Amino acid sequence: MYKIQLLSCIALTLALVANGAPTSSSTGNTMKEVKSLLLDLQLLLEKVKNPENLKLSRMHTFDFYVPKVNATELKHLKCLLEELKLLEEVLNLAPSKNLNPREIKDSMDNIKRIVLELQGSETRFTCEYDDATVNAVEFLNKWITFCQSIYSTMT
């Protein structure tokens, strides 16, 4: 009689783990990764907003897309990952003393690594983007706010 309940419980647990559901032991790691992502995005924003980067003024004319719905879950990071490629290309168009191509690549690679770790095995999510676009500063601010929100709900 209890075998069926036990097997059901095991099957449910395996299904949750296979689908990337966070476990209690991973919460601490997730918090560290979200905090790390937040710091990387803030650092990138500082460099983009730096007034010494006059060459980057044209960068602010490029349009970036943000999710149609408010990003509230880690699965929404897929949308960041998709637009991050464009941001990296735009930043490489206007290298400056504060933002050289090697730093850009290192920063982007680190952000991508963190996002992939936070996403886990969730690959079925499809991003739906808002029709309105934002500039690079607004784009980074949006994702910084997202990270702050996720981090605050975990503490």
Swiss-Prot record:
Q: List the disulfide bonds.
A: 79-127
Record bears the keyword Ligase: no
Q: Where is the signal peptide?
A: 1-20
Spell out where the chain is glycosylated.
Answer: 23
- Molecular-function GO term, any one: cytokine activity
Family from the record: Belongs to the IL-2 family.
Q: What is this protein called?
A: Interleukin-2
